[in-house]
Amino acid sequence: MLKHISSHIAMGCPQDECSICWESMPSGVGRLMPCGHEYHLACIRKWFHLHSGNRSCPVCRTEASVLVDTDHEVKIDLSVGQLLDFYGLLDEIGSQLLAITLQDHSTQDDEVNEEGLAEQRAQLTLVQCGICGEMNGDIDTCCNRCHHMYHHSCLGQLLVEVNAEREQGWSHCIFCYEQLVPLYISGARRVLSLQDRGVHRGRVRNNRSILTELIYERSGVLVHGIEDQHASQHDINDIEHSWHLLEQNRQRKQLEYQDKCKIQAHVRRILDHYYHCAKVTKAQYTFINKKVSQTLYALSRGVYPAVDLDYDGIAKTLILDEMEKLSS
């Protein structure tokens, strides 16, 4: 399978499916150089996060030096050292990152307030939801204390999943329990403005995570900043149990992608046999892999390995069922 994909690329043929998730790639494609293999940007970002320090192509194992966003023809240098600070990194790849600019700094005289300028530059950062990890303009809620940000819909979904009452935490940060406030976003300028440089899921990243967490892709979002409001106090003890459940669910979600990769390995191992025997086509392989893997995700109930599941046995049974349906 890998040799087939490699030769396909070598002949100059575009890939129609991501070799990590086996889904189509109509957009959001990243190409590794020099090997030329293509993946969903989100998939290759997660792959590199799971294999920290390893920049090898998942298909051919060639060391990648550049990742190209094919939608925008943006090239990202993957060899930038991890010891560079955040602004050094921006200087290194700034010319490649679409139109990222700092806020205008204007004064009525020729004197420059260096302290004010430094404070202004420190606001150039990026936004990521503390629950789902996505970075987009739909993030609408933030915490003034720890600076985590969320989609309002993600907060609601978490409460539903743990059977918590809406008043028990709908409007509070799941990390520090502070009451959340609206995050005002405008598209007037192409600036990302946050207030923290720590490295944490759902927070600002100053070190080099892959593509600096796709900062160039989201460079059209301006966060005007978080209003200096004093959140009202609340009784943490009343919702302590809910927060415990929410934190458990958050940790489970962080492991979910890794677990899915492991579960898919069971499915692909069996499917590879049928594919090499020419019993399933490439399209059928992709369809069956996705459907059977999703069934195993559901059966696992967020835990891998589930002690009561024979993954290989169940995968084989489900695969044969799907093959029979496709042949009828």
UniProtKB/Swiss-Prot annotation:
One of its GO terms (cellular component) is nucleus. The keyword Cell membrane does not apply. The keyword Cell division does not apply. A zinc finger (RING-type) spans 18-61, 129-177. Pfam families: zf-RING_2 (PF13639). Keywords: Cytoplasm, Metal-binding, Nucleus, Repeat, Zinc, Zinc-finger. GO terms for molecular function: ubiquitin protein ligase activity; zinc ion binding. GO terms for biological process: ubiquitin-dependent protein catabolic process. It is found in: Cytoplasm; Nucleus. Required for tolerance to alcohol. This is Alcohol-sensitive RING finger protein 1. The lineage of its organism: Eukaryota, Fungi, Dikarya, Ascomycota, Saccharomycotina.
